[in-house]
Design a protein with these regions (language model features):
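Broad hydrophobic/π-residue packing in well-ordered secondary structure
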Residues: 1-5, 49, 112, 144-147
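TOPRIM metal-binding catalytic domain and adjacent DNA-binding surface shared by DnaG-type primases
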Residues: 1-24, 163-167
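Glutamate identity and glutamate-enriched acidic tracts
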Residues: 1, 9-12, 19, 42, ...
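Phosphate-handling DNA/RNA-contact segment within nucleic-acid enzymes
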Residues: 19-108
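TOPRIM fold recognition
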Residues: 64-65, 77-167
Length: 167
């Protein structure tokens, strides 16, 4: 249900049934080693396994291109799908939180931050602290997945490609 609500119908490969509910399991790695996972319930609630490492943890979706950092898994799927439609290469790092983006960015060559346009301004603040080029929805409260659902993959892709040209 969660991925369907985010515009990805039929994406069931990481779904586990548990106590009558469907849970999306997103692996988290540090240096290629599995350190835990993020569990996303049907209603979108998210949690990590008790006691697991989250610092520097990421999920990398690699297509041998520019490094792109984002917070969430659905956001990464929107970025991946939009850039694939534009025939662009990418290496997307799902960082699971804005604060963790700073840790993941260390040691990577410059790339593009896909910042959430949080009401609090956290996404943009962290993007500026990292110092890379960044893309952010022009609508407060939106992330790239929300933009994908509002304007479609083509418009999202064109906007992302314009930002990538600045990297």
């Amino acid at each position: 249900e969660y991925l369907n609500s985010k515009g990805f119908e039929g994406a069931e490969d990481k779904i586990w049934g548990h106590e009558g509910r469907k849970i999306l399991v997103v692996p988290m790695r540090v240096g290629g080693s599995l350190v835990g996972c993020q569990l996303i319930d049907e209603d979108g609630s998210k949690k990590f396994l008790y006691g697991q490492r989250t610092s520097n943890a990421e999920l990398v979706i690699d297509n041998k291109g520019v490094h792109i950092l984002c917070e969430g898994y659905a956001t990464a799927l929107s970025i991946q799908t939009a850039l694939r439609k534009m025939s662009r290469r990418y290496t997307i790092h799902v960082c699971f939180s804005a604060g963790n983006m700073k840790k993941v960015a260390q040691g990577l060559p410059d790339g593009l931050i896909i910042a959430d346009n949080d009401q609090s301004g956290t996404g943009e603040r962290v993007a500026k602290e990292i110092g890379w080029q960044y893309w952010m929805s022009d609508v407060v409260g939106e992330d790239a997945n929300d933009t994908h659902q509002r304007v479609g993959l083509l418009k999202l892709g064109l906007s992302l490609v314009a930002s990538l040209k600045l990297v």
